[in-house]
């Protein structure tokens, strides 16, 4: 019976490249001359630090742009609160990986409401979809892509 998995993953290498490109862009931008500003990547959290709140917003736009260029979906961004420490503003951005339980339940409910003849089940941080026909699975893929679940979805492990 054909099946596939719906997962939410990011490529950490591409995130690392995007952060390096963003740091490079910071060093060439005129409005960031003479300003202590940087991006730092540790595990799957990017920390932005600079002198003002306004510059943090600009840095976030730079990071979004470089992530899009590298093929990282910005829907995976989870922005944390801005911290003001002395004269430095810091903000952390975590990348969501894996489909959380409530999102997985919404996805399964959406598939069942569409009345497509498939079975969907939660397996850890992914959703497995099985069905008798490939066409049904492709309908589920189209449905998942068109859904607005605030999380990027990829399809892996397609088996016949």
Swiss-Prot record:
GO terms for MF: nucleotide binding
Xref: SUPFAM superfamilies: YajQ-like (SSF89963)
Keywords from the UniProt entry: Nucleotide-binding
InterPro entries: DUF520 (IPR007551), UPF0234-like_C (IPR035571), UPF0234_N (IPR035570), YajQ-like_sf (IPR036183)
Pfam families: DUF520
Taxonomic superkingdom: Bacteria
GO CC annotations on file: cytosol
Role summary: Nucleotide-binding protein.
Family statement drawn from the similarity comment of this UniProt entry: Belongs to the YajQ family.
Protein name (Swiss-Prot/TrEMBL): Nucleotide-binding protein Patl_4311
Species: Pseudoalteromonas atlantica (strain T6c / ATCC BAA-1087)
């Amino acid at each position: 019976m054909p099946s596939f998995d719906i997962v939410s993953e990011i490529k950490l290498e591409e995130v690392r490249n995007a952060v390096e490109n963003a740091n490079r862009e910071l060093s060439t931008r005129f409005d960031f001359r003479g300003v202590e500003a940087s991006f730092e990547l540790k595990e799957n959290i990017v920390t932005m630090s600079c002198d003002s709140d306004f510059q943090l917003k600009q840095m976030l736009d730079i990071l979004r742009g470089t992530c899009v260029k590298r093929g990282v979906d910005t829907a995976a961004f989870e922005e944390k609160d801005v911290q003001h420490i002395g004269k430095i503003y810091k903000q952390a951005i975590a990348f969501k990986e894996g489909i959380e339980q409530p999102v997985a339940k919404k996805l399964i409910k959406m598939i069942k409401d569409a009345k497509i003849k498939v079975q969907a089940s939660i397996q850890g941080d992914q959703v497995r979809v099985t069905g008798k026909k490939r066409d049904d699975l492709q309908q589920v893929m189209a449905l998942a892509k068109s859904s607005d679940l605030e999380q990027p979805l990829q399809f892996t492990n397609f088996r016949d």
